[in-house]
Amino acid sequence: MAKGDFKLFDVVLDETIGRSTPDVEHERAVAIFDLIEENSFEPVGHPGGPYRLSLSLVNARLVFTITTQDGEAVATHILSLTPLRRIIKDYFMICESYYEAIRSSTPSQIEAIDMGRRGIHNDGSQTLKDRLKDKINLDFDSARRLFTLVCVLYWRG
Protein backbone atom coordinates (compact mmCIF):
# COMPACT_ATOMS: atom_id res chain seq x y z
CA MET A 1 0.00 0.00 0.00
CA ALA A 2 1.48 3.32 -1.03
CA LYS A 3 0.98 5.92 1.68
CA GLY A 4 -1.12 8.75 0.33
CA ASP A 5 -2.37 6.90 -2.76
CA PHE A 6 -5.93 8.20 -2.50
CA LYS A 7 -7.36 6.59 -5.61
CA LEU A 8 -9.89 3.95 -6.56
CA PHE A 9 -8.51 0.97 -8.45
CA ASP A 10 -11.87 -0.83 -8.69
CA VAL A 11 -15.58 -0.06 -8.41
CA VAL A 12 -18.13 -2.83 -7.97
CA LEU A 13 -21.91 -2.43 -8.16
CA ASP A 14 -24.27 -4.78 -6.38
CA GLU A 15 -25.01 -7.38 -9.07
CA THR A 16 -28.03 -8.81 -7.21
CA ILE A 17 -30.05 -5.84 -8.46
CA GLY A 18 -29.82 -7.02 -12.07
CA ARG A 19 -29.29 -5.28 -15.38
CA SER A 20 -31.11 -2.33 -16.89
CA THR A 21 -31.63 -0.82 -20.34
CA PRO A 22 -28.71 -0.63 -22.78
CA ASP A 23 -28.53 3.17 -22.32
CA VAL A 24 -28.29 2.85 -18.52
CA GLU A 25 -25.75 0.02 -18.75
CA HIS A 26 -23.64 2.10 -21.14
CA GLU A 27 -23.72 5.04 -18.69
CA ARG A 28 -22.66 2.66 -15.90
CA ALA A 29 -19.73 1.24 -17.87
CA VAL A 30 -18.49 4.69 -18.92
CA ALA A 31 -18.81 6.08 -15.38
CA ILE A 32 -16.86 3.16 -13.88
CA PHE A 33 -14.15 3.37 -16.55
CA ASP A 34 -13.79 7.15 -16.16
CA LEU A 35 -13.85 6.93 -12.37
CA ILE A 36 -11.08 4.33 -12.27
CA GLU A 37 -9.00 6.21 -14.85
CA GLU A 38 -9.06 9.50 -12.97
CA ASN A 39 -10.31 10.03 -9.44
CA SER A 40 -9.56 11.50 -6.07
CA PHE A 41 -10.94 9.31 -3.27
CA GLU A 42 -9.75 9.82 0.29
CA PRO A 43 -11.51 8.04 3.15
CA VAL A 44 -11.19 10.44 6.09
CA GLY A 45 -8.61 9.23 8.60
CA HIS A 46 -7.12 6.47 6.43
CA PRO A 47 -3.42 6.68 5.46
CA GLY A 48 -3.85 5.65 1.82
CA GLY A 49 -5.00 3.12 -0.73
CA PRO A 50 -5.58 2.39 -3.51
CA TYR A 51 -9.16 1.39 -2.77
CA ARG A 52 -11.94 -0.84 -4.01
CA LEU A 53 -15.40 0.68 -3.65
CA SER A 54 -18.44 -1.58 -3.54
CA LEU A 55 -21.76 0.23 -3.93
CA SER A 56 -25.09 -1.30 -3.02
CA LEU A 57 -28.62 -0.42 -1.97
CA VAL A 58 -29.89 -1.92 1.27
CA ASN A 59 -33.31 -0.95 2.64
CA ALA A 60 -33.41 2.19 0.47
CA ARG A 61 -30.00 3.26 1.76
CA LEU A 62 -26.82 3.69 -0.23
CA VAL A 63 -23.97 1.56 1.14
CA PHE A 64 -20.32 2.41 0.40
CA THR A 65 -18.01 -0.47 1.36
CA ILE A 66 -14.35 0.48 1.04
CA THR A 67 -11.40 -1.94 1.12
CA THR A 68 -7.74 -1.66 0.21
CA GLN A 69 -6.10 -3.47 -2.68
CA ASP A 70 -5.05 -6.14 -0.17
CA GLY A 71 -8.67 -6.65 0.92
CA GLU A 72 -8.29 -4.86 4.26
CA ALA A 73 -11.58 -3.31 5.41
CA VAL A 74 -11.33 0.48 5.51
CA ALA A 75 -14.89 1.66 6.17
CA THR A 76 -18.54 1.12 5.44
CA HIS A 77 -20.68 4.23 5.10
CA ILE A 78 -24.46 4.14 4.86
CA LEU A 79 -26.34 7.14 3.46
CA SER A 80 -30.04 7.78 3.27
CA LEU A 81 -31.20 8.29 -0.32
CA THR A 82 -33.87 10.78 0.76
CA PRO A 83 -31.80 13.92 0.00
CA LEU A 84 -30.96 12.52 -3.46
CA ARG A 85 -34.28 10.91 -4.39
CA ARG A 86 -35.89 14.02 -5.93
CA ILE A 87 -32.76 14.91 -7.89
CA ILE A 88 -32.46 11.35 -9.20
CA LYS A 89 -36.11 11.31 -10.33
CA ASP A 90 -35.69 14.68 -12.06
CA TYR A 91 -32.50 13.43 -13.67
CA PHE A 92 -34.22 10.33 -15.06
CA MET A 93 -37.11 12.39 -16.41
CA ILE A 94 -34.80 14.75 -18.26
CA CYS A 95 -32.68 11.82 -19.52
CA GLU A 96 -35.81 10.29 -21.06
CA SER A 97 -36.55 13.62 -22.74
CA TYR A 98 -32.95 13.80 -23.94
CA TYR A 99 -33.01 10.31 -25.51
CA GLU A 100 -36.34 11.11 -27.20
CA ALA A 101 -34.98 14.44 -28.45
CA ILE A 102 -31.95 12.76 -30.01
CA ARG A 103 -34.31 10.86 -32.31
CA SER A 104 -36.61 13.68 -33.34
CA SER A 105 -35.54 17.18 -32.27
CA THR A 106 -33.38 19.93 -33.68
CA PRO A 107 -29.79 20.34 -32.50
CA SER A 108 -30.71 23.49 -30.53
CA GLN A 109 -33.53 21.65 -28.72
CA ILE A 110 -31.19 18.76 -27.90
CA GLU A 111 -28.57 21.20 -26.61
CA ALA A 112 -31.11 22.94 -24.35
CA ILE A 113 -32.26 19.63 -22.86
CA ASP A 114 -28.65 18.51 -22.43
CA MET A 115 -27.79 21.72 -20.56
CA GLY A 116 -30.67 21.03 -18.17
CA ARG A 117 -29.56 17.42 -17.79
CA ARG A 118 -26.02 18.47 -16.92
CA GLY A 119 -27.32 21.05 -14.44
CA ILE A 120 -29.40 18.47 -12.58
CA HIS A 121 -26.47 16.04 -12.67
CA ASN A 122 -24.22 18.73 -11.17
CA ASP A 123 -26.77 19.36 -8.39
CA GLY A 124 -26.87 15.65 -7.57
CA SER A 125 -23.09 15.41 -7.66
CA GLN A 126 -22.68 18.34 -5.28
CA THR A 127 -25.34 16.94 -2.93
CA LEU A 128 -23.55 13.57 -2.86
CA LYS A 129 -20.17 15.26 -2.31
CA ASP A 130 -21.64 17.31 0.56
CA ARG A 131 -23.23 14.24 2.17
CA LEU A 132 -19.90 12.39 2.06
CA LYS A 133 -17.64 15.29 3.13
CA ASP A 134 -17.04 14.03 6.69
CA LYS A 135 -16.49 10.46 5.45
CA ILE A 136 -14.79 10.58 2.05
CA ASN A 137 -13.01 13.50 0.41
CA LEU A 138 -13.78 13.60 -3.32
CA ASP A 139 -13.08 16.00 -6.12
CA PHE A 140 -16.10 17.19 -8.11
CA ASP A 141 -15.41 15.01 -11.17
CA SER A 142 -15.23 11.90 -8.97
CA ALA A 143 -18.50 12.94 -7.30
CA ARG A 144 -20.11 13.32 -10.76
CA ARG A 145 -19.13 9.80 -11.76
CA LEU A 146 -20.27 8.41 -8.41
CA PHE A 147 -23.61 10.19 -8.80
CA THR A 148 -24.04 8.46 -12.18
CA LEU A 149 -23.45 5.10 -10.48
CA VAL A 150 -25.89 5.95 -7.69
CA CYS A 151 -28.50 6.71 -10.36
CA VAL A 152 -27.82 3.35 -12.03
CA LEU A 153 -28.25 1.54 -8.71
CA TYR A 154 -31.43 3.47 -7.96
CA TRP A 155 -32.84 2.76 -11.42
CA ARG A 156 -32.10 -0.95 -11.18
CA GLY A 157 -33.11 -1.24 -7.52
UniProtKB/Swiss-Prot annotation:
Q: Which InterPro entries match?
A: UCP032146 (IPR008321)
* Family membership: Belongs to the UPF0262 family.
**In its UniProt entry, what is this protein called?**
UPF0262 protein Avi_0642
Species assigned in the record: Allorhizobium ampelinum (strain ATCC BAA-846 / DSM 112012 / S4)
